[in-house]
Amino acid sequence: MLNGCSTWRTNDVLDRVIPTNDRPWVADMQRLSTAEIQGEEVVVKNIRNCQYVTANDYVVNYYDRRIRLEDLRTVDFLVVPFQTKALAHTMLSFGLADGTFLCVSVEIRKELGEEYSPLLGVSNQFELYYLVADERDVIRLRTRYRDAEVYVYPTVATPENARALFLDVMRRANQLALRPEFYHTLTNNCTTNIVEHVNKLQPQRVPFGWQVLLSGNSAKYAYDLGLLDNRLPFEELRELARVNDLVTENFESADFSRRIRARHGEIAAGLEATQNQSYADAEMSEQDEAEFPSGEFGDEFEQEQAPPEPRSSTRGPFRAPQFRPG
């Protein structure tokens, strides 16, 4: 009877007790991404770069890349909402000095014939998979072939943050290659792992809240915590972060990653304008104070003529973490 139940593997019950890297994996998940950390350089192995015909018809390509830590410059937070908008897949993309990006996506490692199910994800049905991929692979797959929305949010991470985070992520990938783990829908998924990486570098930087479980809200949560620059209204930031139309326009572009971030310049310009307005407001306040010293015309006049408060900014809570051994 158990053998006829399509929702469970037909292998021994140990399949759901002991995770393993030895299963009949789908073609695009047969290799594990790992890293050789060599002082100030990291050699990333098995970076995936599939060429897709459809979501399920593709040519699998891999390449290795040697990265100097000093070339790591930025970290972007990628959000791919599900049809149920409260849920989303989240990823990190690391920007390098030459304008290219490496994306890290924490996923289930699918066996042949397997599909993702949140319910099965709480019953040790899937192994956890750290995929390091060319950004063109994971973004084009989701926008064109899965018809999903993709949002690319620039974070406030410094280059030092980016290097520390990248090292911690790659050490985790190496760990999973040696000691596999089961994916869990609630406790060991894409978003919870990102949160753990950030909190390892800066303890309690991201409190565990409902926004982590309902990851469709994770970008707003990161915004509220100051991990995304929050000097623009979130809805405006979200609109500028959506890249689907830019992916379509630049699908085959050699500088794909730079072009899909065209609106990041608008984000920076908007932030600069906001900052300049704050400076102008502050300067006006100083001029008014010089012309009308406090108390000269009485409290009533001061209350009526008080200049507006400069708009505050919470940019900067993502402070440079110390490097910690993995």
Put a short name on every predicted segment.
Residues 170-326:
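Activation targets extended, charge/polar-rich intrinsically disordered C-terminal tails
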Residues 1-2:
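Sec-dependent bacterial lipoprotein signal peptides
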Residues 133-173:
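A structural motif
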Residues 8-14:
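N-terminal, Lys/Arg-enriched amphipathic/low-complexity engagement segments
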Residues 37-41, 95-99, 157-162:
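A short, structured loop/turn motif at beta-sheet edges
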Residues 42, 47, 52-149:
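Glycine-rich catalytic cores of cysteine/serine-nucleophile enzymes that process amide/ester linkages
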Residues 14-32:
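Alpha-helical transmembrane signal-anchor/signal-peptide segments
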